[in-house]
């Protein structure tokens, strides 16, 4: 209650850390064998595990319009827009950015996509361009990245919803964003913006994976942080 930590508690924590290092042999051989990196890091087994974990964590928070799951192989034109977060790396093949990864994964289900990244704080010009592209699309998927801190992102979502086109909102970082555009009828939380999360999101959107994720936190109302908009543990399935 005082905010002070007893020395014996710190000592106990340090002992646990040192015991684990001893168990792992880090005192005898503390360095990484760089020649074995390719054998250990990024193996097919690791990628498969990451995909499975991502599939299980995507959370369908709202599906009020019954828009999901999407029907595959329709050839419909989908605008993939909004905030990114991941720009890819030099080792990536093709466009592995947040939106690029999502678009590519959606195209595997037989739709045509257009990517337009607006960034995490879109100005009026970028929002206007996104709206124009939305009006020429059959469906819009907009990603948000901590939109609760960005009025530009909040306005973007509201302006896209105002087009009358079907809009899917996917938070690619915190799930709290929904509190700032509660009129969105279709909302998911992906918790990540790298390719593995975007590929899992696409599988959920098209029903290849039935969403089983649950909110790990409560989403509070924007105007009253003590009131729950969606409670801890909430999550929908098909």
State the predicted function of each range.
Residues 1-238:
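Preference for extracellular/luminal or secreted protein segments
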């Amino acid at each position: 209650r005082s905010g002070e930590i007893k020395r014996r508690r710190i000592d106990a924590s340090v002992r646990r850390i040192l015991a684990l290092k001893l168990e792992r042999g880090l005192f005898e051989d503390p360095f990484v064998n760089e020649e074995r990196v390719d054998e250990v890091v990024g193996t097919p087994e690791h990628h498969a595990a990451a995909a499975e974990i991502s599939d299980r964590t995507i959370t369908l928070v709202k599906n009020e319009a019954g828009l999901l799951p999407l029907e595959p192989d329709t050839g419909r034109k989908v605008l993939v827009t909004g905030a990114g977060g991941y720009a890819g790396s030099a080792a990536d093949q093709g466009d592995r950015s947040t939106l690029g990864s999502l678009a590519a994964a959606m195209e595997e289900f037989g739709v045509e996509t257009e990517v337009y990244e607006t960034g995490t704080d879109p100005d009026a010009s970028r929002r206007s361009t996104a709206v124009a592209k939305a009006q020429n699309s059959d469906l819009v998927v907009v990603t948000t990245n901590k939109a609760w801190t960005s009025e530009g992102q909040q306005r973007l979502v509201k302006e896209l919803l105002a087009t009358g086109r079907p809009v899917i909102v996917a938070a690619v970082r915190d799930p709290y964003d929904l509190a700032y555009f509660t009129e969105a009828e279709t909302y998911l939380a992906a918790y990540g913006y790298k390719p593995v999360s975007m590929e899992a999101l696409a599988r959920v959107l098209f029903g290849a994976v039935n969403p089983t994720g649950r909110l790990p936190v409560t989403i509070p109302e924007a105007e009253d942080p003590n009131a729950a908009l969606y409670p801890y543990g909430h999550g929908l399935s098909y």
